[in-house]
Amino acid sequence: MQSSLLKKISKVPLSLQKKILQKGILQKRDLSFAKILLLKCASYLGDRLTGNNNCEYIRAVQRNGEEAPKILFIDDRMPYDFLGAGYPRSRVILNILSKLKVNASFIPLGFACNDSPSMIHSHFPDNIDYLLSLNKDSIFSFLYKKRNFFDAIIISRPHNMEYLYGVLKYLKRYKPSLKIIYDAEALICYREILKQETLGQPFSTEKQKMLIDQEKALFSVADSIYAVSPSEKKLIQNYYPDTPISVISHCVESHQPINGFHKRENFLFIGRLNENDSPNVDSLIWFCQEIWPSIRKQLPQAKLDIVGLAEASQLKPLKNQDDINFHGRQDCLDEFYAAAKVFIAPTRFAAGIPLKVCGAASHGIPIVMTEVLLTQLDWPKYSSLGVHWQQSSQFTQTCVKIYNDEEYWNEMSQQGLEYINTQYTKEQMYRSFVTSLEQLNLL
């Protein structure tokens, strides 16, 4: 019996297994049965382990009828725009859900949220349920109790899919009509592989294959997949050619530049800079060490404005430089967009769509970016501004050329605006998202 059951039950995160053992519910020799109990008896165990018998909601002010499809959206945290890291895109998805004939709920799974209803509703739609008290322990109990309630579950980010993979398979067996939508955005393993190559510590061929196999396995439970770009869609399609894959990118509203060429003088970098090993921190440090000194020799009047949360310890030396200004989190970026002559995106490894690049382009700021980002954006007209990160001298000269050449600056400014107006409109994102739900008979 044990053998047959174990074949049917997918793995449960080790953290939950340990909690069961620590509570004395099971002995260590019964660890395999912990997996079974977590799924079969999730209601009991979830409440016992978390002490969370009731889930507090911020309930929707108004809902559609009971016959409307019920869709649960799971991401790491409440998707405030200032967080970056894909959260602005999640906020747009919430906005779209709020406009459809569905009853939507949202769970910020990874980070506790103590924001008041008024705070939540000032940033997000008020006709969505926000289940703020759920966490990585109580989610299993909740999903078990609601196993016959939801018609679709949207899961964002690979680590969330990995964490919930086992219980999602169980829910699919219990309710075959349930639709699982995996908002993968991109294959993150390729970023990790590129990161190690960039740092001069490449993974072995076997390690690369293992990472790819592990991540692509997460897609197997999905009835539909979201990618953020056509290039990411092609990568995923290589592994799952028969699963519907929709490009759900982002929407950005374009703005004609407030200031012209001669009223601008700064370089601008925007991004979250809290983690030392993040692509943003790596790229900024590389730029400031390898590129910025050469730019300053040719443009001594230039300053570098850095906007975004910046708590990474590796940034401390940069904060002492007079020519580099850290401005922290800013709710409004208009002032910085208006002052910037050149936007820099020196990313050396990444996956997905760089929303900060789209934001700068939407304000008519020419961008100097690495080939990594240029490829992700599929931005052929901007090819002259895509520089391999190892070519530091070329990156420097491209920055200086845009800074000094008014005609070239105007040309690149207009090309960026045209690209945003054709590739990142609200209508395109709305239609792509709605079509994806229609394909699953959810609308």
Question: Where do the model's predicted regions map?
Answer:
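Membrane-proximal helix-turn-helix segments that form the acceptor-binding/catalytic region
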Residues: 188, 203-225
